[in-house]
C-alpha cells in the first residue's frame, strides 16, 4: 500500500494472530487499529458448506475429501482457514484498546449504525454508504478478488444489506456441531 494515496486503508485479514501481529508491529511504523468481525461459527461453517457445494473450484474440493465432515474438519484444523481467524479473534482480546468488535448479525441487520461506530472508532467523519444496493468494492482500480481460493467465496447478494437464511445450517454434520457448536459470539 506504500504507493496508495489514501491516508486510511482497511485490509481484510487475520492481523491479530501472534505472528501477523508481530509483523505489523515490526514493519508498520505507525499506530494501527483492528476491526474484528464476530460471526457465530455454525453460520460460518454453513456458508463454507454452501460455497464449496455450489462452486466446484472452491479450495475444500481440491484435496480429495469426500464428506462435509472431512471438508469442515480440514477448515477447522489448526492450520485451517477458520481456525486462523478464530486464533486472531482470541488473540485480539490482548489488544482491546486497538480493536473494535462488530457482530456480523448487527452489521447485516443495522449496517448504518455499525458503520457509524466504526467511523467513530477510527476517528473519521461518517461517510454515507449505499446499503440498499451496495455493489462490488473497487479502490485504486482494484476490485476484491478471492478467486485463488475459489469462485464466489464472498459474493454480495443483490439488493439491500440483510441477513439471508442459509439452509446449510441444518446440514452441518452432528460431530462438527458437537465439537464446535459452543463457539458463539
What are these regions (language model features)?
Residues 23, 109-113, 153:
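Short acidic alpha-helix initiation/capping motifs at coil-to-helix transition points
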Residues 9-13, 36-38, 101-103:
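Short beta-strand segments
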Residues 1-31, 54-66, 157-158, 166-171, ...:
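PAPS-dependent sulfation machinery
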Residues 1-2, 42-122:
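PAPS-dependent sulfotransferase catalytic domain
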Residues 49-52, 90-93, 120-185:
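PAPS-dependent sulfotransferases, especially Golgi type II membrane carbohydrate sulfotransferases
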Residues 27-51:
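Conserved phosphate-donor/acceptor-positioning beta-strand/loop module used by diverse small-molecule
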Residues 34, 99-101, 184:
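Conserved beta-strand scaffold positions in the cores of enzyme catalytic domains, especially
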Residues 20, 78-89, 114, 168-180:
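Alpha-helical packing segments of well-folded alpha/beta enzyme cores
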Amino acid at each position: 500500500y506504500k504507493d496508495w494515496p489514501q491516508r486510511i486503508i482497511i485490509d481484510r485479514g487475520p492481523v491479530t494472530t501472534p505472528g501477523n501481529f508481530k509483523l505489523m508491529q515490526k514493519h508498520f511504523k505507525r499506530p494501527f487499529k483492528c476491526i474484528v468481525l464476530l460471526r457465530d461459527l455454525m453460520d460460518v461453517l454453513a456458508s463454507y458448506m454452501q460455497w464449496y457445494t455450489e462452486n466446484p473450484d472452491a479450495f475444500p474440493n481440491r484435496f480429495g475429501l469426500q464428506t462435509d465432515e472431512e471438508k469442515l474438519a480440514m477448515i477447522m484444523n489448526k492450520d485451517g482457514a477458520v481456525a486462523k481467524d478464530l486464533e486472531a479473534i482470541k488473540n485480539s482480546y490482548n489488544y482491546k484498546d486497538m480493536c473494535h468488535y462488530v457482530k456480523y448479525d448487527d452489521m447485516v441487520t443495522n449496517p448504518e449504525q455499525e458503520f457509524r461506530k466504526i467511523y467513530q472508532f477510527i476517528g473519521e467523519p461518517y461517510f454515507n454508504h449505499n446499503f440498499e444496493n451496495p455493489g462490488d468494492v473497487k479502490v485504486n482500480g482494484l476490485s476484491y478478488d478471492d478467486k485463488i481460493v475459489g469462485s464466489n467465496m464472498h459474493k454480495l447478494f443483490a439488493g439491500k444489506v440483510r441477513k439471508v437464511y442459509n439452509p446449510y445450517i441444518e446440514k452441518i454434520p452432528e460431530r462438527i456441531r458437537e465439537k464446535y457448536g459452543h463457539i458463539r459470539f
